[in-house]
UniProtKB/Swiss-Prot annotation:
This is Putative phosphoenolpyruvate synthase regulatory protein. Belongs to the pyruvate, phosphate/water dikinase regulatory protein family. PSRP subfamily. HAMAP family: PSRP. It catalyses: [pyruvate, water dikinase] + ADP = [pyruvate, water dikinase]-phosphate + AMP + H(+); [pyruvate, water dikinase]-phosphate + phosphate + H(+) = [pyruvate, water dikinase] + diphosphate. Bifunctional serine/threonine kinase and phosphorylase involved in the regulation of the phosphoenolpyruvate synthase (PEPS) by catalyzing its phosphorylation/dephosphorylation.
Length: 272
């Protein structure tokens, strides 16, 4: 069974996507065709979005599901004229919040993305630069400045998790790939041993890892299920030998991985 889901926003669409993905993941038997429509900031753009939604409804023979974070009341009114199930995320929560606080909201677009705090912006930019400079074991001399060092086999989610921790929480993150050569005697590389208290491991299901690696190098030893299984068994043995906390990321989104890493390591976020 297929249905179309739209994520509609006057900004980047990230909020609508995040909430929408969380909700739709509860309906595993339905295949959703997902469409993001960001920066809908005028009456004309809203009507164009409505036309696309109505077209999908006609083609699918079923109402699309629309997750909307439109703030402007006129745009929201136009949207509600389309043939779809509208989940108005601002409309659902803004009015009760106004009633409780006794204050009318500004209904201004992109308030959440304004750079209100120059210091927070600086922290975020510096954290992202650090994550990029210390990605994939390229440099290890600055590990003393890292808040956390993610380790794991190739293609296990280290880089995107590091970038998310930097962007969302302002943390200085590094990551280091463990290879077959590191598993001979289960010794940690010297660069990691010196910062063992900062290490956090990621692991993943062997079949899932094989599928991910096959997208890059199909048919190679690197992507074979046998190779992936061997690496992961040795990896988890290394984690256990050195008492390194780790997380199975197979069924988790990057957001979920990052939040759990933060909690399990007891790290304090620099950005609120």
């Amino acid at each position: 069974m297929k249905r179309t889901a739209f994520y509609l926003s006057d900004g980047t669409g990230i909020t609508a996507e995040t909430l929408g993905h969380s909700m739709l993941s509860q309906f595993g038997s339905i295949e959703f065709i997902q469409v993001t429509l960001p920066f809908v900031q005028s009456d004309e753009q809203t009507r164009e979005a409505v036309a696309r939604i109505n077209k999908a409804a006609k083609e699918d023979g079923a109402k699309p599901v629309v997750f909307s974070t439109l703030v402007n009341t006129d745009h929201r009114a136009i949207l509600h004229g389309c043939d779809a199930l509208i989940l108005d995320l601002f409309g659902a929560f803004l009015r009760p919040l106004e009633d409780e606080l006794g204050v009318r909201s500004s209904h201004k677009i992109n308030q959440s993305h304004a750079i209100r705090d120059a210091e927070s912006y600086r922290i975020r930019i510096n954290a992202v630069h650090f994550a990029l400079d210390n990605d994939d074991g390229a440099r290890t001399r600055h590990y003393d400045q890292a808040d956390i060092i993610l380790i794991g086999v190739s293609r296990s989610g280290k880089t995107p998790t590091c970038l998310y921790l930097a962007l969302q929480f302002g943390l200085f993150t590094a990551n280091y790939p463990l290879t077959e050569d590191d598993f001979d005697d289960l010794r940690l590389p010297k660069a990691l041993m010196e910062h063992k208290h900062k290490l956090f491991g990621l692991t993943i299901d062997a079949d899932r890892l094989s599928a991910i690696r096959s997208e890059r190098k199909a048919g190679s030893k690197y992507a074979s299920p046998r190779q992936c299984d061997m690496e992961l068994r040795a990896l988890e043995a290394m984690y256990n030998k050195h008492n390194i906390p780790y997380l199975d990321a197979t069924e988790l989104s990057i957001e979920e991985i990052s939040t759990r890493v933060l909690a399990m390591k007891g790290l304090k976020r620099r950005l609120q």
